[in-house]
Amino acid sequence: TLLPTVALPDPADGPLDPAAIMPGAKQVWLEIGFGGGEHLAGQAARHPDTLMIGCEPFLNGVGSALRHIEEGGLKNVRIHADDARAVLAALPDASVDHVLILFPDPWPKARHAKRRLVQADVVSEMARILKVDGKLRFVTDWKAYADWALARFLETPGLVWMAEAADDWRNAPADHIRTRYEDKRLGDTEPVFLLFERRAAPAA
């Protein structure tokens, strides 16, 4: 099986060192909840010098991603087949260039909102691991989750929304890779693209 060769070191064993995981990597990207892995593998193929870390707790998605990795002969992907929070906690400060969250489980009912990935403490960890000028990308097709997530991101020190016009949320980034999930249109709105940048703390 391919999984042992592409498995991320277990974050329970201690801090993760991206430079040791892929020596010489020019960038580090983290995709949280990669689903079937089309986006993860597609970006890895485009950026062979980038360490692509993917987190996905569902084994069907992991199996699909492994097929994409094998078919593409990709050497720059590492997978954590479990909850992403442990990976966030184990990554060093300012060690990641890109955090990507594409179509996470929406938990659309208000009483389930606390089950969503995007919570204040988790977003603070994302901000901590991002390098200055690093990017965070969040995409959902559920309006309530888009509103919820935008509020969580905006209240997080160090994250700045990159929107320049009122309808920027409609526009996919130039490097966006569509997935089967996106094409199914399961949500209640068109895809909402929220892009943020990590800024340095102001000098005291």
Residue locations for each model-derived region?
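S-adenosyl-L-methionine
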Residues: T1-L30, E38-H47
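SAM cofactor-binding core of SAM-dependent methyltransferases
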Residues: Q27-A86
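A short acidic, Gly/Pro-enriched loop at the edge of an enzyme's catalytic core
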Residues: A89-H98
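A short SAM/SAH-binding and catalytic strip from SAM-dependent methyltransferases
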Residues: D97-R116
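Class I S-adenosylmethionine-dependent transferase superfamily signal
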Residues: V99, M126-A127, L136, A149
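A short glycine-rich, Lys/Arg-flanked "PGG" loop and its adjoining helix->strand segment in the class I
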Residues: V118-V132
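Conserved beta-strand signature within the Rossmann-like core of class I S-adenosyl-L-methionine
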Residues: V132-T140
